[in-house]
Amino acid sequence: MSRSRITLLRTHCHECAYVSGRTARLEFLSPTLRLNDHRYQLLLEQGFRRSGPYVYRPHCPGCKACQSLRIPVARFRPRRRHRRCQRANANLHVTACPPVMTQEHLALYRRYIDHRHPRSSMANPDHAEAEGFLAAPWCTTVFYELRTEAQGSLLAVAVTDVLPDALSAVYTFYAPEAEHRGLGNLAVLWQLSEARRLGAQHLYLGYWIADAPAMAYKASFRPHEIFDGRGWRAQE
């Protein structure tokens, strides 16, 4: 899928949600373009990402702080902090579920958004808004549920796209009272193990900004690769 064969549209400039004082702008694919898992994986390789059915990448004037980050699955080696996280959560069970927002999912998602983004446009979503943000009709998506025991309390959901040769972490939401368990990191570790089981080459973690504390955890998974607009650079 070459750039000459796709139509890119651009949003208006708006205030950046991650870097204070910066202006943000996105370019996105025309909604008329027919997508599937294979085509979307090619777009991920070029620095794109999806939000619901919309595929976009940053195109900000005078700023390239947002960089796509992916982990080469076969080369990943957990650090001490990752092993501690796994041991602390050894009692959790993971179940793969279809990308359908149940009432239980929605209640957890709302609590998470209210805790992490109380004044954002994401606050208090209804069912259609939540499911529309997390899933896409043309993409194979799995909701990985993390529970305290089989059929026990739902602590987290790791929304993941399962592609021909890669996994992409779409969004993870979890119980605010369980934040100390490091469930975001645990979700990535699970996605890596699942990618290894499926024989996938990469796990895509979305965009990373070096100066954004909320994104610092992504760079702790090493080695990883950063897309610089022309190719992927290894970061050991």
Curated annotation (Swiss-Prot):
Alphabetized UniProt keyword annotations: Acyltransferase, Cytoplasm, Transferase
**Any one GO CC term of the record:** cytoplasm
Question: What catalytic activity does the UniProt entry give for this protein?
Answer: N-terminal L-glutamyl-[protein] + L-leucyl-tRNA(Leu) = N-terminal L-leucyl-L-glutamyl-[protein] + tRNA(Leu) + H(+); N-terminal L-aspartyl-[protein] + L-leucyl-tRNA(Leu) = N-terminal L-leucyl-L-aspartyl-[protein] + tRNA(Leu) + H(+)
Record has Cytoplasm as a keyword? yes
Main localisation:
cytoplasm
Q: Where would one find the signal peptide in this protein?
A: none
- The record's EC number reads 2.3.2.29
Compartments reported by the entry = Cytoplasm
Gene symbol of the encoding locus: bpt
Q: Which SUPFAM superfamilies does the protein's record reference?
A: Acyl-CoA N-acyltransferases (Nat)
Mind listing the GO molecular function terms for this protein? Answer: arginyl-tRNA--protein transferase activity; leucyl-tRNA--protein transferase activity
Q: What is the recorded name of this protein?
A: Aspartate/glutamate leucyltransferase
- Write down the top EC class of this protein: transferase
Which organism is the protein's source? Halorhodospira halophila (strain DSM 244 / SL1)
Which family does the similarity line name? Belongs to the R-transferase family. Bpt subfamily.
What the protein does comes down to: Functions in the N-end rule pathway of protein degradation where it conjugates Leu from its aminoacyl-tRNA to the N-termini of proteins containing an N-terminal aspartate or glutamate.
Q: Which GO terms describe its biological process?
A: ubiquitin-dependent protein catabolic process via the N-end rule pathway
- What PANTHER family does the annotation carry? ARGININE-TRNA-PROTEIN TRANSFERASE 1 (PTHR21367), ARGINYL-TRNA--PROTEIN TRANSFERASE 1 (PTHR21367:SF1)
